[in-house]
């Protein structure tokens, strides 16, 4: 089985998508269409922008969406996935890649989502940290000793299956 699994916010990097823009007429057309839809040159920020600009939610989310969808489109003839999935923002990329949602509507949805999240972040300044490799109880204990509102969340479980066991569960 082959799958596209699309990332959420946090996968951005300066220069993302430039290789696609340079090598594919279809990708270039989508970047230019995105610039028009968004009302700003997202491609310039993605290709040449400062990390601080790219980290803003209102920029990051459309950038990751664009990169994901354009990359999937460019690979389309060579790699046909059996399924698509995404994490958070990546769910919208998956909808577009699977043709359940068209590119323009997907981008408009992501843009609206990103602006709303940016507004919420500005109204309620906060931060998030990923803690890896520590026991959940220890993380909760540390959180109790920090002033202000601190919440341990996003508990992820570790799973390990042999290939046969994973196939049995999935198929």
Mark where each language-model region is:
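A short, hydrophobic C-terminal helix/tail in secreted or cell-surface proteins
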Residues: 165-171
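Residues that mark the start of a beta-strand
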Residues: 1-2, 127
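A broad detector of short, well-ordered amphipathic alpha-helices
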Residues: 32-33, 66-70, 91-92, 104, ...
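Alpha/beta catalytic cores of group-transfer enzymes, especially the acyltransferase/condensing modules
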Residues: 9-11, 38, 98-160, 164
């Amino acid at each position: 089985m082959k799958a596209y699994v699309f990332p959420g916010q946090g996968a951005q990097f300066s220069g993302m998508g430039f290789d696609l823009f340079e090598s594919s007429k279809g990708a270039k057309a989508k970047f230019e269409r995105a610039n028009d839809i968004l009302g700003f040159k997202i491609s310039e920020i993605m290709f040449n922008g400062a990390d601080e600009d790219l980290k803003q939610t209102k920029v990051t989310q459309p950038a990751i969406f664009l990169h994901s969808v354009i990359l999937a489109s460019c690979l389309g003839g060579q790699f046909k996935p059996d399924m698509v999935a995404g994490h958070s923002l990546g769910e919208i990329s998956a909808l577009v890649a699977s043709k359940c949602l068209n590119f323009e509507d997907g981008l408009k949805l992501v843009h609206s989502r990103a602006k709303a999240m940016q507004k919420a972040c500005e109204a309620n300044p906060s931060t998030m940290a990923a803690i890896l490799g520590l026991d959940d109880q220890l993380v909760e204990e540390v959180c109790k000793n920090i002033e202000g509102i601190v919440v341990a969340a996003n508990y992820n479980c570790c799973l390990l299956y042999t290939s046969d066991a994973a196939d049995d569960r999935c198929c």
